[in-house]
Amino acid sequence: MNVRTPDPNPGWLSEDDLYEARRRLPMVYVEAIPVRCDSLGYVNEVGLLLQASDQGEMVRTFVSGRVMYRETIRAALLRHLEKDLGPLALPQLPPSPVPFTIAEYFPSPSETGLTDDRQHAVALAYLIPVTGECDPRQDALELSWLTPSEALSPSIQAEFSGGRAALLRQALAHAGWGR
C-alpha cells in the first residue's frame, strides 16, 4: 500500500521511468531538519514530522525530497520546505548551502546504517532555521517541536525508521548538542 501523496508535477520522470532509474542510478535528495534558534543561534527546538510509512506505521522523519533535473540545491531545499511545512514557514537558508553531512541510503543494510528500500539515494542533509508559522502538508500528519533533549530521548529515537535517528543525532552534534 502506498500512502505517499502523488506529486502533481513530478518535474522530470514518469512513475515507470523513475522506477527504472532508481534500479540503475543513485538518486540525489535534500533533507532538511527544521529548527528554531535563540538570539545567539543555539538550537532551542527541532521540528520532526510524523507520517505514515508504506507499511501503515507512524514514523518520525524530516523534510526530504529529490533534486530535479536543472534545479539548484537551494531551490530544491526551498521547494521541499514549502511543500512539507507550508508557505509561511519562512526558512532561513544559509548563505552557502553546505550540508552538515552527506547521507547515503541503500536498499539493504550497509555500513552507513541508512536504508531506503526503494533505491540507492545520496542526500545532502541540512539544519534549517525557520521563523514563521509551520503548517505540515503533503504526507505529514503533524509537525512536533521538541527540545533537543526530547528529540534525543530513546522513545523519540525509536520512532524513526531507516537509520534516520542516527542522522538526527549527527545533526544535533553538529549544532553543539551532546558534547
Model regions: which residues?
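Nudix hydrolase/Nudix homology domain
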Residues: 55-60, 119, 125-179
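Residue-level signal for short segments within beta-strands and strand-turn junctions
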Residues: 34-36, 50, 130
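Active-site segment of metal-dependent pyrophosphate-handling enzymes
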Residues: 86-134
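A structural signal for short, well-ordered beta-strand segments
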Residues: 32, 77, 81, 126-128
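Conserved Nudix-box catalytic region and its N-terminal flanking loop in Nudix hydrolases
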Residues: 41-90
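Acidic, metal-coordinating catalytic segment for phosphate/diphosphate chemistry
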Residues: 1-39, 115-116
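A structural signal for the main folded, soluble domain(s) of proteins
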Residues: 33, 37-38, 43, 82, ...
